Amino acid sequence: MKTNKNKTNIKMIGFYHFFYFVKPYYLLINENVIIFKAKGDFMIQKPRGTQDLFLNNSKEWNAVEEKFRKVLNLFNYGEIITPMFESKELFVRGVGDSSDIVSKEMYEFTDRKGREYVLRPEGTAPTVRALIENKLYIQENLPYKTFYIGPIFRYERPQAGRYRQFNQLGVETFGIDSISHDVELISLGQSFLKELKINKDVIVEMNYLISGNERKEYELELKKYLNLFDDLCSDCEIRINKNVLRVLDCKIDGNKFAEAPKMTLFASQENKERLNKTFDQLKQLGIEAKINFNLVRGLDYYTGLVFEFKNIKTDQAIIAGGSYNNLVEELGGPNLPASGFAIGIERIMMILSDQEIKVADEDELDLFIIPLSDDAQFLTNKLLLEARTANLKVDTNWNIKNLKAGFKSAERLKSKNIVIIGENSINSDIYAIKDQKSGETKELKFKDIVKYLKGEK
């Protein structure tokens, strides 16, 4: 590749070339890699819309996942892990070709045999595919309650809390359709936010999406209303004819439709009562909620109840979900009701940062070892092994040349205790353990160090 010293070199690398990191689920795609030359060295930057997690950020990230698993375990949900790429047809049929996701946001590729795949742009359709393929819907498994954690890929404009590769916490339930379950599902979301201590200033907005002839009548009325506008965005113009409900979810013109016909005016008495009863039960459980008649979801498969947990101050959605009672059958399975929700981990991390909330436990070492001689190196490794076998968190720095550097490393790593291993301590078998909090020093034989750290006599 020819280079110009005064210009940045940009090279497009094939979409098929990628690297996968198991934790925290990062698939870095060389979709638009920038390579530039500086002082004779080439540097490759991460793709636009992705991020690297390390140190405190990765600890907080893992803590969010752990708290999610903790709450889901209390609600008796089991984890499911599906592939990161699936057949393109799964999302065309499942999500709907009128959705932004399918029409313009999917990362698509064709394998060597001409099969069309996509990096998964959402988590529900793959879960339904797994349910059907593995026959998890048999009667003794129902209701089937599961959750997933993993990366999602959408080609959209990166912005605060929104990436082209982002990560979702998702909840799915199959084989049950009732007001009580809807309330429990929403209370699950509330429990997770409470576990993270970010449930303040949050309200649940909800609506009920009608179906059948009622929906057809409503869509005709909505089209009449929308045809009064002569300045709708190009996406809305397309959606009016493909899936008119999606116009209400438009990110550009959505705020224009406050006076749009209300769906409940066309709903059956049964559907109205279900929405109102769900609302009343949430209030009785202390979950703040309101009915938003213009709330629709960005995915075509939703039916019945839809909801969003929104921050009152920022108007940002934190959790979004609802019912999709036709999706299993549409993807080739039995007629089975389903519901769930999803949460973006990046959005959660942004909220935690804004509110200065830490969810990870304080990261401290039980012991930091300072080796001051060649003979001390072996004893240090011996003590490290014994302590770690006893489930103690211990460390050293093999580059240490003096006490000052050792104490500096121990302080940086927030070690509770420090032990120095030098020639004198080796010869006498007396080792001084310093408690960093109290400042007290305890003299011990080598064989007693681990027992002391474990609180044993």
Curated annotation (Swiss-Prot):
It is found in: Cytoplasm. PROSITE patterns: AA_TRNA_LIGASE_II. CDD domains: HisRS-like_core. One of its GO terms (cellular component) is cytoplasm. It catalyses: tRNA(His) + L-histidine + ATP = L-histidyl-tRNA(His) + AMP + diphosphate + H(+). It comes from Mesoplasma florum (strain ATCC 33453 / NBRC 100688 / NCTC 11704 / L1). This is Histidine--tRNA ligase. PANTHER family: HISTIDINE--TRNA LIGASE, MITOCHONDRIAL-RELATED (PTHR43707:SF1), HISTIDYL-TRNA SYNTHETASE (PTHR43707).
